[in-house]
Amino acid sequence: MDNIKLTIAYDGSNYHGYQLQENAVTVQEKLEKALNTVYYPYKITPYSASRTDSGVHAKGQVANFFAPKQIPIHKIPLALNTNLPNDIAIINAEVVGSNFRARRDAIKKEYRYYVYHAPYMDPFWRNYALHYREQNLDYTKLQQAANDFIGKHDFSPFRAIQGSNPSIDPVKEIYEFDIDVNAGEDGNLIIFKVIGNAFLYKMVRILVGTLLQIGNGKLEINAVKKALQTGDRLFVGPTASPQGLVLQQIWYP
């Protein structure tokens, strides 16, 4: 049996997240169906690095699975893509060591969040960015406050309470948090790029929601510092909508 690592991209618009759910269509369901078609009669179960939420996208999701050596590794992407819907694609497949686990062995992840900042919404971005109409957005404050997230902190106030696992350690480390403004062909995109060792449930979307409220003056410039110091959610903004979020990349040793 080979342990095979997949890199997966998907448009999450039509899915209730990555992880299997009863009575809901998920990315994992489609992936398992394709795997079990390709490797029939074997039952194949993929193990993913990240469980993205409903409506969230990925360019660099990673999963691993164990399968018999019946398909050459270079043919696996085409074999799976032939059996996947056109909003899910296998980008790469490689054989890894038998001890590799996509979730456990990840050392850092990059998420990107896209905001379309204009009075109107470009129809081509409606499923891939948050539409932000308010014009009084201070870009300097956005980056200044984003810098306060960098480092190792207890991010408890920046995770969704409902649906989260309280046993997960809330101490995470953010390595980089960069914001590109006036991006895109028309200059209306704001791209939040955050890299960390791991993230709590809906954490990235809450970080972005907080920064937007700092940028428009609804929260003070030191709100991030106060939230991290006190754990008080009074200094935290709303959860940004899911369609702007992309799991960009995952690193391994």
Swiss-Prot record:
Its EC number is 5.4.99.12. InterPro entries: PsdUridine_synth_cat_dom_sf (IPR020103), PsdUridine_synth_TruA (IPR001406), PsdUridine_synth_TruA_a/b_dom (IPR020097), PsdUridine_synth_TruA_C (IPR020095), TruA/RsuA/RluB/E/F_N (IPR020094). One of its GO terms (biological process) is tRNA pseudouridine synthesis. It catalyses: uridine(38/39/40) in tRNA = pseudouridine(38/39/40) in tRNA. It comes from the Bacteria. GO terms for molecular function: RNA binding; tRNA pseudouridine(38-40) synthase activity. Keywords: Isomerase, tRNA processing. The keyword Nucleotidyltransferase does not apply. PANTHER family: PSEUDOURIDYLATE SYNTHASE (PTHR11142), TRNA PSEUDOURIDINE SYNTHASE-LIKE 1 (PTHR11142:SF0). Formation of pseudouridine at positions 38, 39 and 40 in the anticodon stem and loop of transfer RNAs. Homodimer. HAMAP family: TruA. This is tRNA pseudouridine synthase A. It comes from Natranaerobius thermophilus (strain ATCC BAA-1301 / DSM 18059 / JW/NM-WN-LF). The gene is truA.
